[in-house]
Amino acid sequence: MVTINGEPRAAEGLTVLELLASMQLIPERTAVMIGGEILPKSNYNQTLADGDEVDLIGFVGGG
């Protein structure tokens, strides 16, 4: 199990990009933290492992 924003989810084995796609999130507008560390967008092909704690932060434009 992977914990995503505090909720357990069976996402181990997915890459970060696959996870974002499954959640209908836009990678360019989503910051990803794994284990409390910000993941650079260049590493979004990283595979999630059992026990990873992931936080997703979406950005919305506006004015």
What is each model feature region?
Residues 1-62:
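Ubiquitin-like/PB1-type beta-grasp interaction modules and other compact soluble beta-rich domains
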